[in-house]
Amino acid sequence: MDRRLGFHYFQDINHYQSRDLALWLPELKALNAGWMVLKSPATMAIPEEFIASLVSQGINPIIDFDLQVNTQVRPEELRVILAAYAKWGVKYVVFFRSPNTKAAWVDGTWSNGDLVERFLDRYVPFMRMAEQNGLVSVFPPLQPGGDYWDLSFLKKLFQLVQQRRSLDFGSNLHMAVSAQTFSRPLSWGAGGPLQWKMPRPYTKNEIGEEDHIGINTWEWYHHLVKSTLNITPKLFLFWFGASSIYQNTLDPSLTFDSLYEQFNSARDNRAADSILGCLFWVLASPSGDPRENTSWFDDQGKPKQPSIAAYKEKLEHTRKQEVEYPVAGKVAEWMYPIDHYLLLPSYEWGVPENTLDRVRPILRDSRPTIGFSLIEALNARKVTVWNENAAFSEKDIDMLRQ
């Protein structure tokens, strides 16, 4: 099953104890989460037990240092912490806050000129330090719009990268991208500049036009990267489902289930293959914290929306239906003309209408050969049996195991 769903964890550093693991790990497993953004101080590492426990369950931590761009912290000061994180199984780090916002810069330094170039000069040494420790530095999420228009910021940044020919910035470009809705429809801005006119900074959209300031910001960034650097970036959708992280609001019209379906529908877009993770904002916050209004769970682990429980039930049902049986290895691998076969049930009256809809995640992730023939399935190296309503008997399954 798909493991690209994830969460932003508590926005403090006080929930990394054994009791927190005991509370949240079962929930994350039940939701089939594959990613977790964790806030980290620059002076000490998150406990190894917490990191290692997530990794052992297939949950990839993304370490977020949340540094102001021109803080006094130097890359060398993070060497030991980064080495520890890499040793414990971490692969991705984010160093800075949204650099196109004034809040990301030390007071009095925002208007010093050459903002984008100053950021790039600051960012590259941290990126190199991450690489030296076997980690990938994820480009920080820009605020759509922002105090410095985000699309202009990116375009200027990529122009600088091209000018500095020795800077191998784009070969392994990973970006965090805002997926805030700003209370706009989930379809807002879908298709990016291939569908809509490029918006002018800080001006009202023309009648009938849509811009990038919504949940589909990633499509606009993806196009900008491809058109300027001619590479395909790897993307993490940050703050997914928040109306605005700065106003601490969730869109009341959205449910967990509808947001997940939005993510699934976006994946029908070929560009969505570049999305590594979809990080919901926010898993939980302490009682009384302003972000409590935007959390999906309370601080005791109780879901705030019935749709979360319904989603978990749907996942559990899928787990029971989707059973993979590796074909017996008595014959050399090259003897199997089919690599992966998805065996679907059929009945005298036909095929259930919703079967193909329900197996779409398997089709997207594995691209198997699809069929209804047990005999044909015997020619595959691996068979996934969609055993809905016990359509296949134990005798059928045993044939595949032999």
Residue ranges, per PLM feature:
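Acidic (Asp/Glu)-rich catalytic clusters
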Residues: 1-2, 22-31, 44-62, 80-90, ...
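Catalytic-core region of carbohydrate-active enzymes that cleave or remodel glycosidic bonds
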Residues: 58, 84, 121-128, 214-274
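Alpha-helical scaffolding within the catalytic cores
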Residues: 18-24, 43-52, 73-83, 148-167, ...
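Substrate-binding cleft of extracellular glycoside hydrolase catalytic domains
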Residues: 41-43, 49-153, 391, 397-402
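Boundary/entry segment of secreted carbohydrate-active catalytic domains
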Residues: 1-43, 324-369
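Aromatic-rich peripheral "rim/lid" segments of glycoside hydrolase catalytic domains that contact
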Residues: 4-27, 247-331, 398-401
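Acidic-and-aromatic substrate-binding clefts and catalytic sites of carbohydrate-active enzymes
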Residues: 9-21, 34-49, 67-77, 100-103, ...
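Aromatic- and acid-rich polysaccharide-binding/catalytic face
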Residues: 38, 63-65, 97, 139-143, ...
